UniProtKB/Swiss-Prot annotation:
GO terms for biological process: ribosomal large subunit assembly; translation. Component of the ribosome, a large ribonucleoprotein complex responsible for the synthesis of proteins in the cell. The small ribosomal subunit (SSU) binds messenger RNAs (mRNAs) and translates the encoded message by selecting cognate aminoacyl-transfer RNA (tRNA) molecules. The large subunit (LSU) contains the ribosomal catalytic site termed the peptidyl transferase center (PTC), which catalyzes the formation of peptide bonds, thereby polymerizing the amino acids delivered by tRNAs into a polypeptide chain. It comes from Dunaliella salina. Its main location: cytoplasm. This is Large ribosomal subunit protein uL18. Residues 245-264 have a biased composition (Basic and acidic residues). Residues 245-271 are annotated as: Disordered. Component of the large ribosomal subunit (LSU). Coiled coil: none annotated. It is found in: Cytoplasm; Nucleus. Belongs to the universal ribosomal protein uL18 family. The gene is RPL5. InterPro entries: Rbsml_uL18_euk, Ribosomal_uL18_C_euk.
Amino acid sequence: MGYVKVVKTSPYFSRYQVKYRRRRQGKTDYRARLRLVRQDKNKYNTHKYRLVVRFSNKNVTCQIVYSTIQGDVVMAAAYSKELPNYGLKVGLTNYSAAYCVGLLVARRILTKLNLADTYKGQEEPDGEDYNVEPVEDGPKPFYCLLDTGLKRTSTGSKVFAAMKGALDGGLDIPHNEKRFVGYADKKLDTEVLQKYIYGGHVAEYQETMQEEEPEKYQAHFSSYVENEIEPDGIEDMYKEVHAKIRENPCPPKKERTKPADAKRWSPQAHL
């Protein structure tokens, strides 16, 4: 038998340092988080805001967050499950829906800070890269950083669709057009990006499947069939959703009903 070096010795275990809980669970990249959270030493009591974008199987979440010693504070949040209130009932996790959620959280935070009329953003997205310009006599635009978490930042990722929606909504986010869908050969194809914002890629696939595999189309696009959404009407549908989001980004909350009086049951004494 060959020589086997003993690695995990008593000194190894005595010096072993347990990693943070969320690192052990594989939920947080603390190296990236430190660079997103740490503020300059000469900016006293100034928050560093982040646009947090997360994806699940059925939902897209966008939040405006800043960190404190006690924990993170969420200033505004938007979810794709809210989009049916604005007229979008299908495809709540695709590229176009991620754009809508980013637009919604941007308009929501600017409305909360009374900046919605000052910074309206790109009201009619044309696929061009948009950067908000500060007004001369007024407050600066709301500045935040994109927090992608553990999501891989590949070109064309839905993370950047949410960021594009927030940019067009009027937020100031440092970015590069290289990560938007349609970027190839060192230039951005604005027509491709505009097509994805308005769901054109879904409409194309819908038309192809209707012609080639009608039976599979009924199953794959069952929610579209149920809501009577045809490929020709998808672009107009998304335009209406964008307009409704800008019109009322903060719908009134439902009033909570008064809870019923708690009944107390005391055991009966048995003789």
